[in-house]
């Protein structure tokens, strides 16, 4: 038994469990209050490893999100009912895939809550008011607790934990607010783009949605590791955080939030799809940006709360074990959604029967 083990054993037991554990250097240390430095090192190491592991997933998810928006904003108003059914089908797939880790009762509850939130948003969109904004904000809160969002949560918290290491609670909260503002900005811009794209729908034609569906299928097969897809060198070499390394930490967090919003936007279904569909129909950039900003404020509120509790961040980082499922789940959703929309463009009567 080496010296580090002997010293650790002299500390006895804490809470009925041995106070000894291996640190990242494979040395035995006490797990008491004198090991805060070891915890910080472990937290940063976990965050860095997770970021490297999911780098390709983020970039592919960014492209996938853009394709999803392209499909949404080019839907005609006559297909509003079809859009709702497609969205609900995709949402059902997400929850079925995630229920295994959360339990049937919790999964069913969250799925039901998201359905009710989506219905409440649809009711409010018929006559906008201050109450409508409150309902949309609440829908953002509910959506942030969905199983799909939980699968992306370790990635988000890993980044927050990385830029929060060694800082005071106030600094961590400030950076998290900047990160959340980046998320909100991206989704608000999606609303504005959707409104302008809705105006130009008559000039777009059917070629873009078909091409977008085909690319979604290819990307889904790549995430499932069925085919190999080489990203352009720009995506392989460009790192937005490295490009912003000379900026203050709050600016870096804001720029990172802009990127993470695209990776997390598929998890906002069906509420986000409902809002984007409405904005594309209303064709009002001000309303579009306001609705998406309100929704995103509710969506990111739990992140700000989580950043207020350092212990919560460390415990939530243990959810990184589910990150191995992000690629296959995203690939299955991309493949299924791409096939459905592709067939819908070519054989609309057949997809109506489905």
From Swiss-Prot:
A Gene Ontology biological process term: cytochrome b6f complex assembly
A single GO CC term for this protein reads: plastid thylakoid membrane
The listed locations are: Plastid, Chloroplast thylakoid membrane
Question: Which InterPro entries does this UniProt record tie to the protein?
Answer: Cyt_c_assmbl_TM_dom (IPR003834), Cytochrome_c-biogenesis_DsbD (IPR051790)
Pfam families named in the record: DsbD_TM
List keywords of the entry alphabetically. Chloroplast, Cytochrome c-type biogenesis, Electron transport, Membrane, Plastid, Thylakoid, Transmembrane, Transmembrane helix, Transport
Q: Where are the transmembrane segments?
A: 135-157, 177-197, 207-227, 260-280, 286-306, 322-342
Q: What is its main location?
A: plastid
**Which stretches face the Stromal side?**
158-176, 228-259, 307-321
Q: How does it sit in the membrane?
A: Multi-pass membrane protein
Q: What happens when the gene is disrupted?
A: High chlorophyll fluorescence and deficiency in the accumulation of the cytochrome b6f complex subunits. Dwarf due to very slow growth and pale green leaves.
Could you name the domain of life of the organism this protein comes from?
Eukaryota
Q: Which residues lie on this side of the membrane: Lumenal, thylakoid?
A: 1-134, 198-206, 281-285, 343-354
Q: What does this protein do?
A: Required for the transfer of reducing equivalents from stroma to thylakoid lumen. Involved in the biogenesis of the plastid cytochrome b6f complex by probably transferring reducing equivalents from stromal m-type thioredoxin (Trx-m) to the lumenal thioredoxin HCF164.
The entry's family comment says: Belongs to the DsbD family.
Q: Which PANTHER family would you find in this protein's record? A: CYTOCHROME C-TYPE BIOGENESIS CCDA-LIKE CHLOROPLASTIC PROTEIN (PTHR31272:SF6), CYTOCHROME C-TYPE BIOGENESIS PROTEIN HI_1454-RELATED (PTHR31272)
| Protein name from the UniProt record | Cytochrome c-type biogenesis ccda-like chloroplastic protein
**What gene, per UniProt, encodes this protein?**
CCDA
């Amino acid at each position: 038994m080496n010296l580090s083990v002997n010293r650790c054993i002299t500390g006895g037991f804490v809470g009925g469990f041995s106070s000894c554990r291996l640190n990242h250097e494979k040395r035995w240390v006490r797990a008491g209050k004198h090991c805060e430095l070891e915890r910080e090192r472990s937290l940063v190491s976990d965050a860095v490893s997770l970021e490297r592991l999911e780098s390709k997933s983020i970039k592919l998810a960014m492209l996938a999100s853009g394709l999803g928006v392209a499909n949404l904003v080019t839907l005609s108003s006559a297909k509003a009912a079809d859009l709702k059914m497609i969205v609900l089908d995709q949402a059902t797939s997400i929850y079925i895939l995630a229920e295994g880790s959360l339990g049937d009762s919790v999964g069913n509850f969250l799925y039901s809550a998201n359905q009710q939130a989506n219905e409440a948003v649809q009711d409010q969109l018929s006559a906008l008011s201050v109450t409508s904004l409150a309902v949309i904000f609440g829908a953002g809160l509910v959506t942030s607790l969905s199983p799909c969002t939980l699968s992306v949560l370790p990635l988000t918290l890993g980044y927050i934990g990385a830029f929060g290491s060694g800082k005071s609670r106030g600094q961590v909260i400030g950076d998290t607010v900047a990160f959340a503002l980046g998320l909100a900005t991206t989704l608000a811009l999606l609303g504005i783009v959707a409104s302008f794209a809705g105006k130009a729908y008559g000039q777009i034609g059917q070629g873009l949605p078909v091409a977008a569906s085909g690319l979604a299928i290819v990307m889904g097969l790549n995430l499932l590791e069925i085919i190999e897809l080489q990203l352009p060198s720009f995506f392989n070499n460009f790192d937005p955080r490295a490009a912003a390394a000379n900026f203050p930490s709050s600016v870096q967090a804001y720029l990172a939030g802009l990127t993470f919003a695209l990776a997390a936007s598929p998890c906002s279904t069906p509420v986000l799809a409902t809002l984007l569909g409405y904005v594309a129909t209303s064709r009002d950039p001000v309303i579009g940006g306001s609705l998406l900003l309100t929704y995103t404020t509710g969506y990111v509120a739990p992140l700000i709360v989580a950043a207020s509790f350092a212990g919560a961040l460390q415990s939530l980082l243990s959810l990184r074990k589910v990150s191995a499922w992000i690629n296959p789940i995203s690939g299955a959703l991309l493949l299924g959604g791409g096939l459905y929309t592709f067939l819908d463009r070519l054989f609309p009567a057949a997809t109506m029967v489905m």
